[in-house]
Regions:
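Conserved beta strand-loop-helix elements of the APE1-like EEP
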Residues: 74-77, 90-105, 205-220
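N-terminal, active-site-proximal structural segment of metallo-dependent hydrolase catalytic domains
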Residues: 1-75, 87-92, 152-153
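Active-site environment of divalent metal-dependent phosphoester hydrolases
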Residues: 17-20, 52-55, 88-91, 143-146, ...
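Beta-strand-turn-beta hairpins that frame and shape the catalytic cleft
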Residues: 2-10, 93-95, 99-105, 117-137
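Short, Asp-centered acidic motifs that coordinate Mg2+ and/or phosphate
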Residues: 8, 43-44, 133, 167-169, ...
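Active-site neighborhood of phospho(di)ester-bond hydrolases with catalytic His/Asp-centered motifs
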Residues: 45-48, 81-84, 169-173, 194
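Metal-dependent phosphoester-hydrolase catalytic domains
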Residues: 108, 125, 156-169, 174-230
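Active-site metal-binding loops of divalent metal-dependent hydrolases
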Residues: 14-15, 49-50, 138-140, 167, ...
C-alpha cells in the first residue's frame, strides 16, 4: 500500500486564529496565510487554532472572511475538515485538515486535561491513490504533565481506530519545548527525524521547536521550515 503512495508532502501550521498580535495592536493575517498555505504545494495540511467563526473579530476586521477559516484556506480542489476544540463567548476554534486526496472518514476526540485548556485530536482517514492513510491533527496542552497524559490518549485512540498495517501521520503543535515526548510517541511506533531540529516558534523569528510530524508505516524523506512573513 505504501509503495502506491510514492511520496507525500505534509505540512503542520498553527495559524493562531488568523490574527497576529494581541489587543488593539493586533492585525488580520488570514489573507497572508491563504497565500502561504497555497504556496506550500502540500498534499496534506494540518492546521491548529483555526476559527470556525468569531463574531467579535468579524465586526472588528472589515475583510474578515465570510467562510470558516478551514474552508477559506483550502486550495482549489482540496477537501477541508474542521472540528471544534474550544467554544468561547464570541465563537469557536479547533483543528483542521486540508487534503488533496478524498476523505473517507473523520472523528474528533476531546483530550482536555483541565478546564482552563480545551484541546482535541482530529482523526481523518484519506484515500491516497487507493491506499488508506490516517492523519491525526493534534494540539497539546501548555503543561508538561498534561501533554504526557494527552499522548497516552493519542495512543489509546490509535489502538482503537488505526489498524497497525495502515500508514499513519500524527502532526501538530505539541508545545514540547524539548524532545520529552519522543519516547512516549515511539512506544506507539511513531517516529520523527531524531537528529534534525528546526525551530518553528515564533514564526517571524523561530527560537523554539514546538511543532512536530510523526509517522508510522511511512519513511520520512526530508524536513524543512518555510520562511517568510508567517
Amino acid at each position: 500500500m505504501i509503495s502506491r503512495m510514492s511520496s507525500l508532502r505534509v505540512v503542520t501550521y498553527n495559524i493562531h486564529k488568523g490574527v497576529q498580535g494581541l489587543g488593539p495592536a493586533s492585525r488580520l493575517e488570514i489573507h497572508n496565510l491563504l497565500q502561504a498555505v497555497q504556496g506550500f504545494g502540500a498534499d496534506v495540511v494540518c492546521l491548529q487554532e483555526v476559527r470556525g467563526f468569531n463574531r467579535q473579530m468579524q465586526k472588528r476586521f472589515a475583510h474578515w472572511p465570510a467562510a470558516g477559516q478551514a474552508d477559506y484556506l483550502a486550495p482549489p480542489g482540496y477537501q477541508a475538515v474542521y472540528r471544534t476544540n474550544a467554544v468561547t463567548r464570541h465563537g469557536e476554534h479547533g483543528n483542521a485538515l486540508l487534503s488533496r486526496w478524498p476523505v473517507l472518514g473523520q472523528g474528533h476526540h476531546d483530550v482536555s486535561d483541565h478546564r482552563f485548556e480545551q484541546r482535541g485530536l482530529l482523526h481523518v482517514r484519506l484515500d491516497v491513490k487507493g491506499a488508506p492513510l490516517h492523519v491525526v491533527v493534534a494540539h497539546l496542552g501548555l503543561i508538561h504533565a498534561s501533554r504526557e497524559r494527552q499522548v497516552q490518549q493519542i495512543g489509546a485512540m490509535l489502538e482503537r481506530e488505526v489498524p497497525p498495517h495502515e500508514p499513519l501521520v500524527v502532526a501538530g503543535d505539541f508545545n514540547d519545548w524539548g524532545q520529552r515526548l519522543h519516547d512516549a510517541m515511539a512506544a506507539f511506533g511513531l517516529r520523527t527525524f531524531e537528529h534534525i531540529r528546526h525551530a518553528t516558534y515564533p514564526s517571524r523569528l523561530p527560537l523554539l521547536h514546538l511543532d512536530r510530524i510523526y509517522a508510522r508505516g511511512l519513511r520520512p524523506l526530508s524536513v524543512q521550515v518555510p520562511h517568510g512573513g508567517q
